[in-house]
Amino acid sequence: MNPPIARQLNLDETKLPAEIFERLSRRGATLKDYRRRREEAIENFGKPGRDPAELGSVMTTIAGNGVWAANMKLAQLRNHWDQVVGQAIASHSAVADFTDGVLTIRAESTVWATQLTYLIPQLTDTIRRNLKGLTITEIRVTGPAAGYTRKWARRR
């Protein structure tokens, strides 16, 4: 006849019930905690400090912290471009890109690109004054992108 399994596996027979029922006792403890938290939530309902926050204030807090701040300032610059450079220039230019502190402005024509090039010091001061969270190290002005030109093959 075979010896009991506890001896075969070198287990302590006095500890077996505790090992078996440990999982059930942990589950019972979590159920007790769940009931206690539920009762506390019911008791604390409506007390000061538990009022819901307005969505706008929560989103402002989230947008103002972390990596969103620079993107929000850039979006603000794009949306209010006419207030930065004036209506006449804004109708012929736009913010094209912002990467690693370099702001790229795309102009409608080379004439407007030249005009914006002369305004770079004033633009830098205005942007730094109005958008304090946006760090601009350089402003580049580009003219219109060269369109696709097809090279016609000459026939001999």
From Swiss-Prot:
It holds the Pfam family DciA. InterPro entries: DciA-like, UPF0232_actinobac. It comes from the Bacteria. Belongs to the UPF0232 family. PANTHER family: UPF0232 PROTEIN SCO3875 (PTHR36456:SF1). This is UPF0232 protein BL0636.
